Amino acid sequence: SGNTIYFGEGSWLTVV
């Protein structure tokens, strides 16, 4: 939880 992953090209995934 609270983890943010950056995939590049402005794509973000936040795992709550």
UniProtKB/Swiss-Prot annotation:
It is found in: Cell membrane. GO terms for biological process: adaptive immune response. The keyword DNA repair does not apply. The keyword Transcription regulation does not apply. Transmembrane segments: none annotated. One of its GO terms (cellular component) is T cell receptor complex. Keywords: Adaptive immunity, Cell membrane, Immunity, Membrane, Receptor, T cell receptor. Alpha-beta TR is a heterodimer composed of an alpha and beta chain; disulfide-linked. The alpha-beta TR is associated with the transmembrane signaling CD3 coreceptor proteins to form the TR-CD3 (TcR or TCR). The assembly of alpha-beta TR heterodimers with CD3 occurs in the endoplasmic reticulum where a single alpha-beta TR heterodimer associates with one CD3D-CD3E heterodimer, one CD3G-CD3E heterodimer and one CD247 homodimer forming a stable octameric structure. CD3D-CD3E and CD3G-CD3E heterodimers preferentially associate with TR alpha and TR beta chains, respectively. J region of the variable domain of T cell receptor (TR) beta chain that participates in the antigen recognition. Alpha-beta T cell receptors are antigen specific receptors which are essential to the immune response and are present on the cell surface of T lymphocytes. Recognize peptide-major histocompatibility (MH) (pMH) complexes that are displayed by antigen presenting cells (APC), a prerequisite for efficient T cell adaptive immunity against pathogens. This is T cell receptor beta joining 1-3. It comes from Homo sapiens. The gene is TRBJ1-3.
